[in-house]
């Protein structure tokens, strides 16, 4: 199983698009998002192409391929608009590793 990990999109449609493009190009089976999906946080500048509604639409389009844990900028409101579960501050993932020698 090929997994792709990404984090800290912070509502940037530009970076969300780049993430999904890389995910598709790599032909990964799951996209693991490590939090900070929509909101940029009060301490951060607005990210490039800040458009959380467009990010929502893009990610909801591949909702069955996403596993996500909550970041420090994610809120319960995010879960109301995202159609995939934003898990607690951690997630458990069973991974089988095979070695060929």
Language model: regions and residue ranges:
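Core catalytic region of metal-dependent phosphoesterases/phosphodiesterases
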Residues: 2-96
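Short hydrophobic-aromatic micro-motifs
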Residues: 97-101
């Amino acid at each position: 199983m090929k997994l792709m990990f990404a984090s800290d999109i912070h509502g940037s449609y530009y970076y969300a698009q780049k993430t999904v493009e890389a995910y598709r190009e790599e032909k990964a089976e799951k996209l693991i998002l490590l939090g900070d999906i929509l909101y940029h946080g009060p301490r951060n500048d607005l990210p490039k192409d800040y458009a959380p509604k467009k990010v929502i639409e893009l990610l909801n389009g591949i909702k069955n391929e996403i596993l996500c844990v909550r970041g420090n900028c994610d809120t319960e409101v995010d879960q109301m608009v995202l159609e995939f579960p934003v898990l607690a501050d951690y997630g458990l993932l069973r991974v089988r590793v095979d070695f060929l020698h």
